[in-house]
Amino acid sequence: MSDVVGEVAREDSEGRGRYFIRLAPEAEAELTYRWSGEHVMTINHTYVPRAFEGRGIAGKLVDTVIADARSEGFKIRPFCSYVSAQFSRHPEWGDLLA
């Protein structure tokens, strides 16, 4: 299902951040978030360039967030429709919902 090029990286800045995959010199997929309190990540947007859609890239971003939430102990509030749909498909993630 996935022929993702590159690894997921994370950038944090004051109160917000993003997960991203560099797909080409000038193309990135990203999932953006902000912190709502100390232990709640509010995911507000997921983007994959049209030329790279259908390769499992957005799913890889979400899987990385889920792994980080489990290892770092934070909850997720999915405002992004894609991430919200993924939570509906994965009831085993329910314990991570804020």
Give the ranges of each region predicted by the language model.
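C-terminal structural segments of small proteins and small subunits
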Residues: T64-A98
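Conserved acetyl-CoA-binding loop-helix of GNAT-fold acetyltransferases
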Residues: G54-V65
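Intrinsic-disorder/low-complexity peptide segments enriched for small residues
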Residues: A29, G59, G94-D95
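A short, internal acetyl-CoA/4′-phosphopantetheine-binding micro-motif in the GNAT/acyltransferase core
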Residues: T46-E53
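N-terminal first-folded block
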Residues: S2-V40
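Basic, gly/Ser/Thr/Pro-rich low-complexity segments located predominantly at protein N termini
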Residues: F20, G59-L61, A85
